[in-house]
């Protein structure tokens, strides 16, 4: 049951949509010129990929909508299952408590994947520029928390920690969508409300 639920949480059209839109937004920002991508390709030794990635994510409009994407993938699935009658079918085969435990795990994984894939689409290629760069530390990090991380553990640690933060971010907002789907019967509100809450908190 859990394996099947995780498969459904990851392999669905909404996951593809969430990841695709996220990646398109991020790379659209790159093409707009936020990042000197041509210079990075022609003269990678003069550009620190990590510095450019941090700069990109600090300005990218992806974060404006990022609170909505984790829940889009699978967070509202409980509402759909309730409306379709599938939840009543499940109750006859497994306890509701156990099923909800599985649901929390599957939703958390879907949220993590929906944010990790877009992050890796940037972090992986930019990490090659970091390795080739003769610029080890950038002034962009002077007032950032990552400056201390680099000093203690090196630049790879920043990529890893940022990835973990993206995973936790995805889990948090996907679980929020699941929570909302327990009390709200309108799926469009469940999709949009996390975005509204995120904007208020942001």
Predicted regions and their residues:
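Transmembrane helix boundary and interhelical loop/hinge segments in multi-pass membrane proteins
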Residues: 71-90
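Secretory targeting signals
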Residues: 25-77, 101, 105-174, 178, ...
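Central hydrophobic cores of alpha-helical transmembrane segments
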Residues: 18-23, 187-201
